[in-house]
Structure formats: C-alpha cells, structure tokens
Regions:
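N-terminal ligand-binding/catalytic initiation module
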Residues: 1-132
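Glycine-rich phosphate/diphosphate-binding loop of Rossmann-like nucleotide-binding domains
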Residues: 122, 130-224
C-alpha cells in the first residue's frame, strides 16, 4: 500500500478559469506547487489569454509505478478534487512526468462524474479533441524566443553550438528545431547523466532512442 500526497493550488482567476499543469515527482511539495501556480497567473497575463493560474502535483516517483498504478493514481486524484475542477473553473494540463495519456485518464475520470467534459484538460490525445502540435509547442516556443532574441541583436543562429539541460518533452523538441535551423547541438543531459560530442549529436536518433525508454547516456555514443 502506498499513500501519496497530492495538491491542487488555485492562485488567481481574475482573468478567467484557473489553468495549470499536473506533475508527478518525488520532490513535489506544497511550496513548489504554490510558487508554480502563481507563475501560471503571470504567464497567462503576460500573453493576454483569458485564464488564471493554478498548479497540481502528486508526490510520487513514477518510475517505481506501473502504467496500471499511474492510471489508478490519476483517477483517484480526480475523484478527490473533481469539485474544484471544471471546463470553466480549473483546467489541467500535462507537466513533469505526465503526458497526453495522463490527461486522457483525467478527462475520463472527470467525465464519469460530471458527464462528457473534454475541455477539463488540455494536452489530451488528438483523437479525444486535443490540439495537433501540442506535444511540440513548448520546446518549439523556447526556440522561437531564442530566434527572436538573435534576430533583434542581428546574430546568426547557424553553426552556433548548443547545450541542452533536460531532454524530456521540452528539450527533445527544442533540440529538434535548433538542429533544423542550423545550430549544432553538442551536449544534452537528463536526470541520469549527460552526453557530449564536439561535432554535434545526431538529434533525430537520440530523440528516437529516448522515446523508446533509453536515457541519453544509453542512447548515443559520445564523451560523457
């Protein structure tokens, strides 16, 4: 039997419904979730979208759990918090160690209680009404900001050497776009370690291997 502590912090809804991700990580605590919820408020306001800020999390190491366990955990979290949630009240999204599948479980559990409610989460599978390109959006957005900065300062991105810390959903797609735009990704790291190759890593092969469950140190040869 495992007892997990879960959180959903709603910071501000002056501009619209609360929205923010749901993360699964062993280091999750209330202070972190409160801080991230407030940041969601400011992010929504900064880009002038009609949402407020919230954040959720469960203190658990997902690597120690089966897919069946994670589904049960997600559904239990929804059952315990459903009265706080809703398409026009509080909308969840993928975050650290959660993904489109997590959002599908979340939506299904909420719909079991309140009726069909696809808008209670974003980042769900396209087949369930999710937005095409959602998986890539954050990583590509990071690169778009960098490109705008370089253009403003009249710097050429081509052949610039890039190091990326973190090779999850954000880092993978940031590396992909940077490589496509002509930058050279020479090093990446994840929670298990890092890898370096002076002439540049094969981002496409590295991303493929990581998607199949490898760490970056297992997926590509280079200087560790």
């Amino acid at each position: 039997l495992v007892v997990c502590r879960g959180y959903r912090v709603q910071h501000n809804d002056a501009s619209g419904p609360y929205t923010g991700g749901l993360r699964y990580h062993a280091a999750v605590d209330l202070a972190e979730i409160r801080a991230l919820a407030s940041l969601m408020t400011w992010k929504s306001a900064l880009v002038n979208v009609p949402f407020g800020g919230a954040k959720g999390g469960i203190t658990i190491d997902p690597d120690t759990m089966t897919e069946k366990d994670l589904q049960a955990l997600t559904r239990m979290f929804v059952r315990r918090t459903h009265h706080l949630l809703g398409s026009y009240r509080d909308i969840s999204a993928p975050d650290v160690n959660t993904n489109a599948q997590t959002m599908a479980w979340f939506m299904d559990a909420y719909s079991d209680i309140h009726g069909y409610s696809p808008a209670v989460v974003t980042g769900k599978p396209v087949s369930l009404g999710g937005a095409s390109g959602r998986e890539q959006a954050t990583g590509w957005g990071v690169v778009d900001v960098l490109v705008s900065y370089y253009e403003h300062h009249r710097i050429d991105l081509v052949d610039k050497r890039v190091v990326i810390q973190g090779f999850g959903n954000v880092g993978v797609w940031a590396a992909e776009k940077l490589s496509r735009l002509g930058a050279v990704v020479v090093a990446v790291s994840d929670v298990y370690g890092g890898i370096h190759h002076g002439d540049g890593l094969n981002v496409k092969e590295l991303a493929r291997d990581v998607a199949q469950g490898a760490s970056v140190t297992e997926a590509e040869s280079g200087e560790l």
